[in-house]
């Protein structure tokens, strides 16, 4: 709604930082944003940009932003953005010493460009590793914490990934939801795959139909532990409060 945005002086572009534990769907969230505003989605990894050849990384950044600005509105998404914008006092690479200022210059004022509004979305599991300059106003003005899935999200994830599997009706679904507290979305997917593969092998060995039982999930929980430690969650909380991490 560009007319309403202009009326209320709402910027069409700008910078958004998605941060939080790994495996929580930050990339999918960025894609959903692009789909919601019907904008081209440019996604690159730091490996696509960085180069050991002098000047190549800078050229790659320039090409990326030029390509995005050819559109009426575009979304650029870079995962593991801390690899592109690390704290300069923590790296000695001459490439990064040149690249970080260039990235900061590209991000400067993107929320004010009404000719070619650009939405830059960066995702990271380590927001405290970002250069302090990128966290100042005018770059990543919006910081969105993407947490571990809550009870409702875990219920939806489990229902989606178990719906076509031969799960014994006796398995207590709420028990599964409760047992996966502290699991990331990726952890839950890994758990289901591990349990399903185990029962598949059993069905092949016994040459008959098998059901995924509660004991199979118990065995899965024994080997598929939550990947995010409580100490990591506390670091995100400190970052959100603006405290030193």
Stretches found by the model and what they are:
Residues 3-11, 16, 28-29, 121, ...:
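C-terminal engagement/docking regions of AAA+ P-loop ATPases
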Residues 1-179, 183, 195:
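Walker A/P-loop NTP-binding motif of AAA+ ATPase domains
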């Amino acid at each position: 709604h560009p007319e309403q945005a202009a009326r209320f002086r709402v910027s069409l572009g700008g910078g958004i930082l998605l941060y939080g534990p790994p495996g929580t769907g930050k990339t999918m969230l960025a894609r959903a944003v692009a789909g919601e505003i019907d904008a081209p989605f440019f996604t690159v990894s730091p490996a696509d940009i960085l180069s050991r050849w002098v000047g190549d990384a800078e050229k790659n950044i320039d090409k990326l932003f030029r390509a995005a600005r050819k559109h009426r509105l575009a979304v650029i998404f870079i995962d593991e953005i801390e690899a592109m914008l690390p704290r300069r006092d923590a790296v000695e690479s001459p490439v990064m010493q040149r690249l970080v200022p260039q990235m900061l210059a590209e991000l400067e004022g993107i929320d004010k460009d009404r000719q070619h509004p650009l939405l830059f979305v960066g995702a990271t599991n380590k927001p405290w590793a970002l250069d302090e300059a990128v966290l100042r106003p005018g770059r990543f003005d919006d910081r969105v914490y993407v947490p571990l899935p809550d009870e409702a999200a875990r219920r939806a994830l489990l229902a989606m990934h178990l719906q076509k599997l031969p799960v014994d009706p006796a398995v207590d679904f709420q028990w599964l939801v409760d047992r996966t507290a502290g699991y990331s979305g990726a952890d839950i997917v890994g758990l289901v795959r591990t349990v399903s593969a185990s029962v598949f092998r059993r069905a092949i060995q016994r040459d008959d139909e098998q059901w995924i039982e509660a004991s199979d999930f118990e065995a899965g929980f024994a080997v598929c532990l939550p990947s995010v430690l409580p100490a990591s969650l506390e670091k995100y909380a400190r970052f959100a409060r603006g405290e030193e991490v």
